Amino acid sequence: MVFVKMTDVYLMIVMLMGLGFSIELSNGHKFYVGGRDGWVLTPSEDYSHWSHRNRFQVNDTLYFKYVKGKDSVLEVSEKEYNTCNTTHPLTSLSDGDSLFLLSRSDPFFFVSGNSGSCLKGQKLAVTVMSTGHHSHTPRHPSPSPSPSASPVRKALLSPAPIPVHKALSSPAPTPGVDPSHSEVLAPAPGPAAAVRNLAGSVAPGVISLGLVLVIMISSMV
């Protein structure tokens, strides 16, 4: 009987963790097109540059802010995007506060409802990555790490973290620290962090509940 109860509890933990993973994946990121400027003809950052430096994933949303009645957002095909043809949109948004769900891993193309504005550059193309990616890090390349930074992974796998000053001063090829990776030398993550690495990310509340149940089971044995 005790074995059956413990099995049920373990099954519940697995189900809760799976539920948390599903909830986390369904909560996409909200991107504000044009930033503070909104969906305008001349934003402070060019739309193509803004799109290039961001990573878009399935279930993310694009938020278009503009003056209702004076502009609109049209989702179009790639051909119509290139020619600024606004006569056959796939989707038309005109409420002034428009949200567009990126529901699949594909390229999406948007133009202003004013064809003249589109010809002047008010158009946006985004490419949505597959669900296998779980990061919204910018796409532009980061500065190349120094040769001494490459063994950081090895340092993480060692029983105890190597002091930063020793890693920098030692002439031997011991792990070093790049300024942009200063947080990597923190204490090795626990089981919950391992789950996040495998599954993308899991709701913290669900993990906490699972750990509490594990502790309760351990006290019963």
UniProtKB/Swiss-Prot annotation:
Keyword Membrane: yes
Record bears the keyword Acyltransferase: no
PROSITE patterns: PHYTOCYANIN (PS51485)
Disordered: annotated segments: 130-185
Expression (tissue specificity): Confined to flowers.
One of the Pfam families matching this protein, by short name: Cu_bind_like
Main location: membrane
Signal peptide annotation: 1-21
Cysteine disulfide links: 84-118
Function: May act as a carbohydrate transporter.
Family to which this protein belongs: Belongs to the early nodulin-like (ENODL) family.
Protein's recorded name: Early nodulin-like protein 4
Native source organism of the sequence: Arabidopsis thaliana (Mouse-ear cress)
Name of encoding gene: ENODL4
